[in-house]
């Protein structure tokens, strides 16, 4: 018999990080290689103003610094998520020039910030 899939719905998108990190910590989901299915009219893949070491060292501090527009990229940098599937609603008239894209996310060697 297959295991049920847990579903979490949150109003502020970045609040889902608490659930993801808890599930990683309890080994309910893998530490890495996760696929994120994201339903939204915005990609939420902005770059938060955080040092890369914070992302890896202190998830609790990280959660205080991310917001609804930039919560996904730290999970990619940390290696938790390797694919984001963004489901853009057909009724949205924003960001109409979207297309499949590959991004590189890393650390600025001078500032130690996420880029």
Model-derived regions: residue spans:
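Conserved alpha-helical scaffold segments that buttress catalytic/binding sites
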Residues: 1-115
